[in-house]
């Protein structure tokens, strides 16, 4: 299983726009083949810091997910939303 943790730092004035863009992606991604879970969390310690935690069956499922039009749209909008660069960690879940 492959795990992705993506941390997003969002400008205060872009918070509502970010959430409007990411919310439909959550449902869409969860319906994709190979998606075990796909959730967005907001930090309790830092306003407008969000962490997307994704669990995928394998790299092929991630590659297919990366073609999701809603994800592509979010990628295009992130420079406008971001207060600073996102941090993305991809890991393989061991036995």
Residue ranges and their predicted role:
Residues 1-2, 95:
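Absolute protein N-terminus
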Residues 2-8, 39-66:
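Short, well-ordered beta-strand segments in beta-rich or mixed alpha/beta enzyme
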Residues 13-16, 47, 65-69, 73:
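Residues at secondary-structure transition points
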Residues 14-35:
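Short amphipathic alpha-helical segments
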Residues 22, 66, 75-78:
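Short, flexible helix/strand-to-coil boundary loops that buttress conserved ligand/catalytic motifs
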Residues 40-48, 76-95:
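Glycine-rich beta-strand-turn "strand-cap" elements at beta-sheet edges
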């Amino acid at each position: 299983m492959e795990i992705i943790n993506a941390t997003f730092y969002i400008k205060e004035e872009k918070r509502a726009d970010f959430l409007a863009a990411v919310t439909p992606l959550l449902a869409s991604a969860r319906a994709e083949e190979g998606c075990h879970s796909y959730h967005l969390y907001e930090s309790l310690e830092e306003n407008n810091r969000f962490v997307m935690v994704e669990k995928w069956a394998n790299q092929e499922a991630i590659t297919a997910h990366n073609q999701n039009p809603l994800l592509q749209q979010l990628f295009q909008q992130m420079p406008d939303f971001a207060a600073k660069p996102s941090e993305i960690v991809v890991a393989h879940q061991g036995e």
